[in-house]
Every structure is written in structure tokens, then in C-alpha cells.
Amino acid sequence: MADTKMKALERLKEDLEKVYLGPLWEKLGKMVTPEPDHEVVPYLWKWETIRKHLLEAGELLRLGRESERRVVYLQNPSLLKHGLIGYSTNTLYVGVQLLLPGEVAPAHRHSQSAIRFIIEGEGAYTAVDGERTYMERGDLILTPAWTWHDHGHEGTEPVIWMDGLDVGLVRNFAGSFFEPYSEDVFPVAGPHNGSTFKYSTGALRPVTDRKRKGYPSPLIAYKWKTTKQVLENLSKLDPDPYDGYAVDYINPLTGRSADLRIGTTMQKLTPGMHTKAHRHVHSAVYHVLDGEGYTIINGVKFEWSKGDFFILPPWSWHEHVNTGEGDAHLFSINDLPIMELLDLEREEAYNKNGGHQSIIDVFQPTL
């Protein structure tokens, strides 16, 4: 009797598959998992490898409508097999962009939110809906979803920055739209760096903006010199046990994330600092602004130095160590705003071994 029933169930399963139906009694555990289930792997790229290939692209590729952006993106190896091109995590895309003197990256807009974090060089600007903001190393620049934006270079040296977009998130929601502007440059509107003049402190609001909507953020550029000073002030207090001295970039009108969908964080690790391990649902991609050290992710040691990038997958144990003689600054983007909005975010402390993982392996980057 049991064998007959099993054979009947197997036939039923085959019949269901033929008409694109499925037996939930067999697949429930795949759909509703006890903990987050994903295929994102941690990975690290050395800066010299990225920069070498990016400069080579600079010699071979000229900007224009045929190639609007000269970017090398960070591909999560485990997601490529599913055709998820350009995915660094399930939700986030990170690329590294090069702009040469005299070039213009043509104006366009898209559904994806985007941030720029400046890595090296000066003399270039990003224009958002016509407001030009000149970029310096360590600055965070916002280009909110569906805003016209272009980049231009009036300086004399290559400028390189990090791009962060919510490509995976928007694709999963089937919400992607893209539109090129009719000209290479969107018409200039207002004074250069205007939003910085108005909102540089983040704690004061011009009376003329009392009725301004909260999104997008009225501040386009978050200057490194301001962020660094805040971190210096914060260093007079006790550090966070998991992130050291860390700040989130916020919208000065709402007090929430600077971008509605992409979280941005800068953290400072003082010499010898070893944070405790924890894990959370949101994923992140890190860039090492300066310093040297390592991060342990699920027991694997990822050694980093100035310029490197590394991926933190969702729900992964992690802790940071500064092995250098000076401060280390780690910039990161994350999908925390969306996880909080959807009430999916959770955080858990690692309670074994005094809050520190044992190292079981050391990651070897591909050079």
C-alpha cells in the first residue's frame, strides 16, 4: 500500500510539473527557510588589480553615447552563474569609474538610486538636475533615482570613484527605466556646490526650505573633511563594539538614510582596534579609504589595505581588525533602508569566545 501511494505521488508530481504547478508539501522548506538563505559569497578585490584594468580601459575606450560610462564592476562570483550580471550582492551593484581630463559622461537618468564615493583625483564634477558639485577624495555624492545626472572633468589628472546602485533590488521588482538626455550635458541650474552651501552642517535648515519635501535629500555632497571631523569628535566617546567609531550619512530633512534605498556608512578603526563579531540581514560592500587590517567573515580572514573592496553577504558573522599604525577608515554601502522598511532587518551578536570568531581560512585574492 505504501509503495503504491508513493508511486502515485510521484506520478502526481510529474503531472504537476508538466503544467507548471508544484507540490508545496515537498518545497515548503526551500521557500520558507529558518534563516536567510542566499548564494552571495564574500569576496575581496585588491586596489592595484582594479586600478590597472581601469586605466587600461581608459586607453582603449572613449566616452560618448556608445559607451556612456567607463566602469569596471565588482561581480559576485556565485551570482554570475544565475545570469545576475553586475550583482555584488542580491540587491547592490558596485563599480569603479574613471573620468579623464576634458571628458564628459553624458546626462541620463534611471530608476536605480546611485551614490558616488570619490577615491582619487580632483577637478571633476557631478551634476544632479543641473547643480554641479565638485568632487574631492573621500566625498560622498548622491544621485537619487530618476534625477538627471552627468559628470565632467575640468582638471588635469584622472579621477576615479566608486559607483553604488541598487541594481538587484530594482531588477527583482521589475521596476527599471532608463532615459538618455537629449544633450550630453543637462542645463546648469543654480550655483556650483549650492546644496553644500545650504546644508553643509546637516543640523541647520534654511528657512526658505521649510516646506521642502523630505526626498530626495537636499544635500548632494557629503564632504570628507566634515565626515572626518565628526569621526574625530566621536572618537572622544566609547566606540560601538561591532563597528568602532561609525556614522551613517543622513538626509538632513528627515534624519533617515541619505538615500531612500541605499544606506551609506563611514567607520573609523583606531590602531589595534578589534571589534566584536555580529551578523545582520542587510548586505554591504566595503571600500577601504585608508589604513590596513583584516575582516573575518564566517571564519575566513580577508586582509585589506588602502583602496581595496570587499563584500559582506547577508546574515554573515563579521568583525574588523586594524593592524596598521594609523587610523583605518572603511566606507560602505548597504541595503539596510529597504530591510528596515520591509521589517526584515535583524541583528545578532556572536556570543562565543568573547565575541570573536576563530579563523579557519585566509582568503587569497585573484591578482
What residues fall within each predicted segment?
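C-terminal functional regions that serve as terminal interaction/effector modules
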Residues: 2-48, 253-256, 260, 271, ...
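A short, N-terminal "cap"/entry segment at the start of jelly-roll beta-barrel domains
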Residues: 2-89, 180, 186-261, 265, ...
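Short histidine-centered beta-strand/loop micro-motifs
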Residues: 83-88, 104-110, 152-153, 258, ...
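A short beta-strand-loop-beta hairpin characteristic of the jelly-roll/cupin
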Residues: 100, 104-137, 144-147, 152, ...
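A short hydrophobic beta-strand segment most commonly corresponding to one strand
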Residues: 115-117, 142, 156-176, 286, ...
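Conserved metal-binding segment of the jelly-roll/cupin
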Residues: 128, 134-156, 161-166, 297, ...
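Contiguous mid-protein beta-loop-alpha structural module that forms a pocket-lining wall or clamp
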Residues: 145-199
